[in-house]
Amino acid sequence: MTHLRFDNRLRQQLPGDPEEGSRRREVSVAWSAVLPTPVAAPSLIAHSAEMAQVLGLDAAEIASAQFAQVFGGNALYPGMQPWAVNYGGHQFGHWAGQLGDGRAISLGEAIGTDGGRYELQLKGAGPTPYSRGADGRAVLRSSIREFLCSEAMHHLGVPTTRALSLVGTGDAVVRDMFYDGHPQREPGAIVCRVAPSFIRFGNFELPSARGDIALLRQWVDFTIARDFPALAGAGEALYAGWFAQVCERTAVMVAHWMRVGFVHGVMNTDNMSILGLTIDYGPYGWVDDYDPDWTPNTTDAQGRRYRFGTQPQVAYWNLGRLAQALAPLFPDQAPLQHGLDRFRDTYLACDRHDTAAKLGLAECRDEDLQLIDALRALMRESEMDMTLTFRGLIDLSPDHPDPAQLREAFYDEDKRVADAPQLQQWLQRYAARLQQDPLPPDARRARMRLANPRYVLRNYLAQQAIDRAEQGDPSGVQELLEVMRHPYDDQPGRDAFAARRPEWARDRAGCSMLSCSS
């Protein structure tokens, strides 16, 4: 018997759909009750021991057949009351109307051992009223990617939803991976995602777009009371303080993305968390050879709206859509603009902090922003790996800056040789700056190690684990998870996980470009 205790405030305090079941429908409520659809043979593939501990689940319970049944969608623990949430959103810059949880079903809000609230949500557990004709399922490859990235991002220090479990369903799912007319049967899986809240910008956009100001206000009041309890005040002042905090949290999240080289890939407003958490791991990727114009999403290959370098601007635009949705609650629009200004101020402050940390400086001067921009330009021109470049700078000697320190960061040997003079020039400039800085060498290196990961979840690493799992060997998933639990540490015997992208992965599906098919 589980020790999980549930307090399902969302279902209790927001208006729900009087009809139950997964029949497709437009509704003017916050949520719909829907049960997961049973699967043939649920089996646990991997789990996060840390997340289980927070929830109070011990090893015996995780290993039990009942656990796989519950988190495979075949059973419920006492207190679980499954629901799917209704929301809208802007997708690739255009209003898309009602969207909702098309294949995500929340089981309940569990109270953790730390007293925190943790919503447990199954992704791939079958159709809901918001599935828009789809089957509500997920394939193993995308589920592995979501499971691993949720935990990898947490250990990188990036605000994120978490993952408790990855369960194979024993059923096949038909998907056309690149929407090119070649559907295939793939193994199915279900991820249990965990977050204090899965509320998105789109939860506020939909009722506002429909003119349902009463429901909009209910969403705002509920969100503040449950998820922002420290906020004080009332009325418009309370709403203004809340919106400013949403903007600040979003800025912090995106600044972390830019620090570690993460590209979300599909920053639609329905994929933006009101808590400033990274949510919905689809066609994401990590920057290998530095390119601010890179996106891993094939759907965005032409427009590149969601490319790496524009993520801060897109986040600001998305917050603008949220402000637009909230405008009916504000007689004076000035507080909304103030919130948007807080995003810019917070992001710039984070960027300066991260610049100092990544370069090992006590503080960031204005000229240091120029210094790091010059490095980025050099990385782009010379096809240098972002992660390996910054990590390689840690052990650089300010007295004898040697370009050989960064040899492993180059993808093209000819460019390494040709661009050696420019790199030497930049290193000398950097070394001169270090000699002016008050941080002792040991403190500098320690600061840099905490800002520049050695291990990131490169797409080719995830794909190797997927390949093994699809052949019946899931051990690679847990092994990769263990590596990503300590991304800033040097891990003896695990150098292969820190290597730059191999040439075979440059253009391979799943390693360079991905689709939204999952």
From Swiss-Prot:
Cofactor(s) the protein requires to work: Mg(2+); Mn(2+)
Q: Does the keyword Transmembrane apply?
A: no
Q: Which cysteines are joined by disulfide bonds?
A: none
InterPro entries found in the cross-reference section: SelO
Pfam families documented for this protein? SelO (PF02696)
Residues given in the record as Mg(2+) binding sites: 271, 280
Using the UniProt annotation, give all residue ranges assigned to the region (Disordered).
1-23
Q: Where is the active site?
A: 270 (proton acceptor)
Q: Which GO terms describe its molecular function?
A: AMPylase activity; ATP binding; magnesium ion binding
Q: Which EC class does it fall in?
A: transferase
Q: Where does ATP bind?
A: 100, 102-103, 123, 135-136, 193, 200, 280
> Which regions are flagged for Basic and acidic residues bias?
1-10
Q: Which reaction does it catalyse?
A: L-seryl-[protein] + ATP = 3-O-(5'-adenylyl)-L-seryl-[protein] + diphosphate; L-threonyl-[protein] + ATP = 3-O-(5'-adenylyl)-L-threonyl-[protein] + diphosphate; L-tyrosyl-[protein] + ATP = O-(5'-adenylyl)-L-tyrosyl-[protein] + diphosphate; L-histidyl-[protein] + UTP = N(tele)-(5'-uridylyl)-L-histidyl-[protein] + diphosphate
Q: Which UniProt keywords apply?
A: ATP-binding, Magnesium, Manganese, Metal-binding, Nucleotide-binding, Nucleotidyltransferase, Transferase
* Entry's family note: Belongs to the SELO family.
Return the PANTHER family for the record: PROTEIN ADENYLYLTRANSFERASE SELO, MITOCHONDRIAL
Alphabetized NCBIfam families for the sequence: PRK00029.1
Which function does this protein serve?
A: Nucleotidyltransferase involved in the post-translational modification of proteins. It can catalyze the addition of adenosine monophosphate (AMP) or uridine monophosphate (UMP) to a protein, resulting in modifications known as AMPylation and UMPylation.
What is this protein identified as?
Protein nucleotidyltransferase YdiU
Origin species, per record, is Xanthomonas axonopodis pv. citri (strain 306)
The gene is ydiU
